[in-house]
A protein has these predicted regions:
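Cofactor-binding loop segments of dinucleotide-utilizing enzymes, especially the Rossmann-like FAD-
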Residues: 72, 148-150, 175
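Short, Lys/Arg-enriched N-terminal segments with co-localized hydrophobic residues
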Residues: 7-25
Length: 202
């Protein structure tokens, strides 16, 4: 990712998300992973995903630092892709209702000019590139992740971020995450612990 683009993103975050907040902390970031309708109550929704929605909304609203979002994004040929052949359930097709962020979170993202990273696969290399570029200009002490699904996209992005920023604390709040199943959620948390990712909220 070009340094000039990263710099413009960085200053956009400062000027728009800070918005007069005296306690705004530019060294702590929150990444909200794939809080989209299809993963909540759509084609791949679960009751566990629905349960965490109020907690995620509350955490985002109260967070005193930059907030970024990822959005799982597929095209109409999804079923022809490798992922589509392994998981033949259409979901998060660009432009559909199921692709959109949960309404309150979408409103927050638009109002606060949050960066939204559309990603065609589990992890976002653009997200990792962006935050590592920002870290070259200003230190990032912590990056916290919340969202869906713990065992697929949360763990993928947590490990990408830990790889990009090995000396930054990467945190996952388990109480604001849900997996494909409760057991796979727990398995992913244990795997992340082994990769020196801090797990809170269990």
């Amino acid at each position: 990712m070009a340094i000039r683009l990263i710099r413009s993103m960085y200053f956009a975050i400062i000027s728009k998300q800070r918005n007069g907040k005296e306690d705004f902390n530019m060294s702590k970031y929150l990444v909200v992973v794939d809080m989209q309708k299809d993963f909540i109550d759509g084609s791949l929704g679960t009751k566990e995903a629905q349960t965490i929605v109020p907690k995620v909304i509350e955490k985002v609203a109260e967070f005193k630092g930059p907030v970024m979002f990822t959005r799982d994004t597929h095209e109409e040929n999804y079923l022809e892709t490798q992922e589509g052949q392994n998981l033949p359930v259409e979901h998060c097709i660009r432009g559909t209702e199921g692709w959109e962020l949960q309404p309150e979170l979408n409103e927050y993202a638009l109002k606060n000019h949050c960066l939204i990273f559309d990603k065609p696969t589990f992890g976002s290399t653009s997200l990792a590139g962006c935050v590592s570029g920002i870290a070259r200009m200003a230190p990032i002490d912590q990056i916290e992740l919340i969202g869906l699904c713990t065992d697929i996209c949360v763990i993928s992005n947590a490990i990408l971020l830990k790889t990009a920023l090995p000396d930054t604390e990467i945190i996952v709040d388990a109480s604001c995450c849900a997996g494909v199943t409760p057991q796979s959620h727990k398995n992913a948390l244990e795997a992340m612990k082994m990769c020196q990712i801090t797990i809170v909220g269990e």
